[in-house]
Every structure is written in C-alpha cells, then in structure tokens.
C-alpha cells in the first residue's frame, strides 16, 4: 500500500471511496464527499492523502485549518477520513491518520482536532479537553484534540464553512 498526496486524477476515486464509506453509516444521503469537494474548491484542503493499493484508491484523509476563538492558531481538523468498506479494519485508516499527523507536524502545525469516537481516536493521541470546545459535537467526549508541541488552547473551534454543507 502506498500513502501519497492526492492528485487531480484522484478526485473522482476519492468521491467514490468517501460515498461508499459513509452511505448508510449515519445517513442514506452522506455529505462527506461534498465537504472534501468544498474544501478543495475553496483552496482549504491543507493536506489530502490517499491510500493506493494495486493502483486503486482505497482510502482518503483530509486535513484543513480550523480557527480557535475566530483566529487561526496553527491547528488543523482531521476529516473526513474514509476507507472502502470491504477493506475497513485492516489498518488503512490508521496508516492514513499516522502519516497525516506526521506530515502536519512537518508543516509546522501546533495540533489537530477531530470529531469522532474516542474509543478509536485515543490510540493516536487524541483526547477531550474541557476548555477546547466544538458546539457541533454530539457530546463533549466526541470532540478531541492532539497537541503536537504546546498546551491545548482554550476556546471554541470552528471548521471551514465547507463542513456545514447540506444536500
């Protein structure tokens, strides 16, 4: 398996992987593929990695800048992340996350946030912090941060407007 940055030739495959990964998971009409498209079109897709297996895109992870208290402070949001359903639970998503976090550090990021299952994301160094909030999280424990160098900032996190897309 190869982990590499997306190219313009990967866009349709990324859309298909994302749709396959999210259809029926939370909704029969997922919007995660539209988030990726919106970030890309706005020039806000800071890091976009694909997992390629035998010449096929089987996974994808996106990272984009977030603001804290209305300011960019060197923090990024992880997501969406998707893996072809037939290949899930085989380490592809974990590899994408690990590689993405390494590359964010190399880019000078101060940390990364995400909304997701703490039982999964804790293994990558993510945890909830009472003073860093995202109002869109279903419960506080589902919004987590992974500081790379400093203490976690305090305040409210806001994702790029592409995250608030609806069908």
Model-derived features: positions:
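Conserved beta-strand segments that form the floor/walls of ligand-binding pockets within enzyme
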Residues: 50, 62, 77, 82, ...
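Active-site rim helix/loop that mediates acceptor-substrate recognition in acyltransferases
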Residues: 15, 22-67
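C-terminal "cap" of GNAT-fold acetyltransferases
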Residues: 135-167
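Conserved active-site alpha-helix within GNAT-family acetyltransferase domains
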Residues: 106, 110, 115-140
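Conserved G/P- and acidic residue-centered "switch" motifs that form tight phosphate/ATP-binding loops
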Residues: 55, 91-93, 108
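A conserved beta-turn-beta hairpin within the catalytic core of GNAT-like acetyltransferases
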Residues: 66-78, 88
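Conserved acetyl-CoA-binding loop-helix of GNAT-fold acetyltransferases
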Residues: 78, 83, 89-102, 114
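A short beta-loop-alpha structural element at the N-terminal edge
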Residues: 2-14
């Amino acid at each position: 398996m190869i982990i590499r940055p997306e190219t313009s030739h990967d866009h349709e495959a990324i859309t298909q992987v994302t749709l396959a990964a999210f259809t029926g998971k939370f909704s029969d009409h997922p919007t995660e593929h539209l988030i990726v498209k919106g970030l890309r079109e706005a020039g806000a897709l800071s890091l976009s990695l694909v997992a390629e297996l035998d010449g096929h895109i089987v996974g994808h992870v996106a990272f984009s800048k977030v603001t804290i208290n209305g300011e960019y402070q060197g923090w990024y949001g992880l997501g969406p992340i998707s893996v072809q359903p037939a290949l899930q639970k085989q380490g592809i998503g974990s590899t994408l996350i690990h590689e993405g976090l390494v590359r964010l550090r190399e880019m000078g990021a101060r940390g990364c946030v995400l909304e997701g299952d703490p039982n999964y994301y804790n293994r990558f160094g993510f945890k909830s912090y009472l003073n860093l909030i995202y109002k869109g999280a279903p419960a506080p424990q589902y919004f987590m941060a992974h500081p790379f160098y400093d203490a976690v900032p305090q305040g409210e996190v806001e994702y790029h407007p592409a995250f608030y897309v609806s069908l």
